[in-house]
Regions:
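Cationic, histidine-enriched alpha-helical/coil surfaces that engage anionic ligands
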Residues: 93-153
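Cys/His-rich microdomains that often coordinate metals
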Residues: 25-26, 44
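Cys/His/Pro-rich metal-binding microdomains
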Residues: 19, 38
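Cys/His-enriched microdomains
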Residues: 3, 16, 35
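Cys/His-coordinated zinc-binding microdomains
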Residues: 22, 41
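A general "terminal functional-core" signal
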Residues: 37, 43-54, 126-436
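N-terminal low-complexity, Ser/Thr- and acidic-residue-enriched intrinsically disordered segments
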Residues: 46-110
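Conserved small/polar residues in nucleotide/adenosyl-binding loops
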Residues: 8-9
């Protein structure tokens, strides 16, 4: 009995040919749809998930130095290790400094040269690893005539070990992408690479921006694109993923989709609906976006876009500065809400390798909880919803205000913030984007 491609029964196509298997609508298939056409009855489905996670204590100490998120990486890694989630992974991904040639696969040569250049005063007065916990508030920043040209001012000022930070942050996502490429060639299982060190989506080709000194996202997508084929990038950060969008705005092999807060004066000020075009999709939201609205967007807008594009890999930036408890207080998302949306994608595109990256998140303990919870969910840990007293570990004191508990009255549900994203507003976005 011949099967037919079922893609059309779920998501309308612009043409009478399946965007994935290239066969005519409802016609008997001459051959099965290749992955990722999960809607074809004869498509091979992944029966198992393999999860790999980036891990490096030395990289953690260096990433802890990022001025906008001092000490955050230690909280994230510490909580993941406290719940023994590393032991449940199929393997870890090493992080060793990226070489200049890796960085210049996207970034401008002179920009990279300036990032890697010596900053004698800063580095002389700060041991690169052993004193990562030192307070840098009173450190006098070296002035350099080129800093302003390359965006190293204001929210991206130079800090000790900047060169090593750039190399390790880039390497975390580069190596995660390489792990995916390697594993895809060796197994039919779904491959998930988790990298909470990465997700610096604002950095541009020739200048730093928005706390982002290197665009590890772009560097990793380029590896996936060159080795596997088309890539779909989904950005869940509160802020528009402008750096990644700009990198691929003329690419036919990379589609970008950013769900973000958009308003006058809200950083970075880009990402309007009207700026969307084929393979560049912006979903600007109003204040108060909650779990149900986010999941609706994922199901009704993002999923059709992914299916129509037919990617060979998916990259998700999981910035969680949209949490109700984040200092921005612009969205009303919960930890479980982020999990529900991300898990829906992982489950419904289970034959596609997926990379999960970090990003924003400025309530550091809640960010650590969110990414630990997401890691546990990806691994299929059954008791994550009932986690209570936090396991003993070296960063436990950071959670004193929470009563040393994972779930509290504050993070187990949304706040009273109103969701200003009406059904009509979201449907207008859906209609516009699916018509491109």
């Amino acid at each position: 009995m011949n099967s037919v491609c079922l893609l059309y029964t779920i998501y309308p196509q612009k043409e009478n040919v399946c965007s994935v298997c290239k066969q005519k609508k409802n016609a008997p298939q001459k051959k099965p749809c290749p992955p990722p056409c999960k809607y074809c009855q004869t498509s091979p489905m992944a029966t198992k998930r393999k999860v790999y996670i980036t891990l490096s204590e030395s990289a953690t100490k260096i990433v802890d130095l990022l001025p906008s998120n001092k000490g955050r990486q230690s909280l994230v890694l510490g909580l993941i290790e406290a719940y023994k989630l590393i032991d449940l992974c199929d393997g870890t991904i090493d992080i060793y400094p990226a070489q200049t040639k890796d960085l210049t696969t996207y970034h401008d040569d002179e920009f990279v040269k300036h990032l890697m250049g010596p900053r004698t005063f800063l580095d002389k007065n700060f041991n690169k690893i052993d004193k990562a916990e030192t307070d840098l508030t009173n450190v006098v920043i070296e002035e350099n005539d080129l800093d302003e040209k390359y965006g190293l001012t204001f929210d991206c000022y130079p800090f000790p070990s900047l060169d090593l930070y750039v190399q390790l942050t880039a390497a975390s996502s580069i190596n995660a992408a390489r792990k995916i490429v390697q594993q895809v060639k060796e197994t039919n299982d779904q491959i998930i690479a988790v990298n909470w060190y990465g997700g610096r989506h604002h950095c541009h080709k020739s200048h730093a921006a928005g706390f982002c000194y290197v665009n590890d996202v772009v560097l990793s997508i380029n590896i996936l694109r060159k080795n596997l084929g088309s890539v779909f990038y989904l950005d869940l950060d509160l802020h528009h993923g402008d750096g990644v969008e700009n990198a691929f705005k003329f690419s036919k092999k990379v589609a970008t989709c950013s769900i973000h807060r958009y308003d006058i004066g809200f950083y970075p000020g880009t990402g309007s609906l009207k700026s969307s075009r084929e393979n560049t999709y912006n979903i600007p939201t109003e204040k108060g976006l909650n779990d149900s609205s986010m999941l609706w967007i994922i199901k009704e807008i993002v999923a059709p876009l992914i299916s129509n594009f037919g990617p060979r890999a998916i990259v998700i930036q999981c910035g969680c500065d949209g949490l109700a408890l984040d200092t921005h207080k612009e969205w009303n998302m919960t930890i479980k809400g982020y999990r529900d949306s991300i898990d829906w994608i992982l489950s419904h595109f289970s034959e596609i390798p997926i990379m999960l990256l970090g990003g924003g998140g400025y309530s550091h303990t809640e960010t650590a909880k969110c990414w630990t919870y997401l890691t546990g969910s990806v691994l299929g840990v059954s008791d994550i919803d009932t986690w209570d007293i936090l396991p003993e570990h070296k960063n436990l004191d950071a959670y004193e205000k929470d009563g040393f508990r994972f779930w509290t009255d504050h993070n187990s549900g949304p706040s009273k913030m109103k969701d200003h994203n009406s059904v009509e507003y979201l449907n207008d976005i859906k209609t516009h984007l699916l018509s491109l």
